[in-house]
């Protein structure tokens, strides 16, 4: 019985990992997450300036990653985004080993 439960937990963990990878699996999202990894926290305006992307594009991708990949923290009128998941940091390190 314990073996079955262990396999079920492992399977659920793999499903969560697959969902995380699916959420990140877009070039623009990877760029955003990479910048957040480098800078620790950025607001939307800063991300727009760094990546030279339209505000609507950045906001759309941030919305898709909120919760699973990113967290937001309000500081006055600004909302700062940062990486919410240690697995995400591991993925970025794997993709950019020189940083």
Swiss-Prot record:
Record carries keyword Transcription regulation: yes
InterPro entries (UniProt xref): ArsR-like_HTH, HTH_ArsR_DNA-bd_dom, Metal_resp_trans_reg, WH-like_DNA-bd_sf, WH_DNA-bd_sf
KW Ion transport (keyword) present: no
PROSITE patterns: HTH_ARSR_2
Gene3D superfamilies, per the entry: Winged helix-like DNA-binding domain superfamily/Winged helix DNA-binding domain
Portion annotated as DNA-binding: 43-62
Keywords tagged on the record: DNA-binding, Plasmid, Repressor, Transcription, Transcription regulation
Domain (HTH arsR-type): residue spans on this chain: 9-99
Top-level taxon in the UniProt lineage: Bacteria
Gene Ontology MF annotations: DNA binding; DNA-binding transcription factor activity
Annotated function: Represses the expression of the pagA and atxA genes.
PANTHER family referenced in this protein's UniProt entry, alphabetically: ARSENICAL RESISTANCE OPERON REPRESSOR ARSR-RELATED
The name this protein goes by in its record: Transcriptional repressor PagR
Organism of origin: Bacillus anthracis
């Amino acid at each position: 019985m314990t073996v079955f439960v262990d396999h079920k937990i492992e399977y659920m963990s793999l499903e969560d990992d697959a969902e995380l990878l699916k959420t990140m699996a877009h070039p623009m999202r990877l760029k955003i997450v990479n910048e957040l990894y480098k800078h620790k926290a950025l607001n939307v305006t800063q991300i727009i300036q760094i990546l030279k992307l339209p505000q609507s594009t950045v906001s759309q991708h941030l919305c898709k990653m909120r919760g699973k990949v990113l967290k937001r923290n309000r500081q006055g009128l600004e909302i700062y985004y940062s990486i919410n998941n240690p697995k995400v940091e591991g993925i970025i390190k794997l993709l950019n080993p020189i940083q």
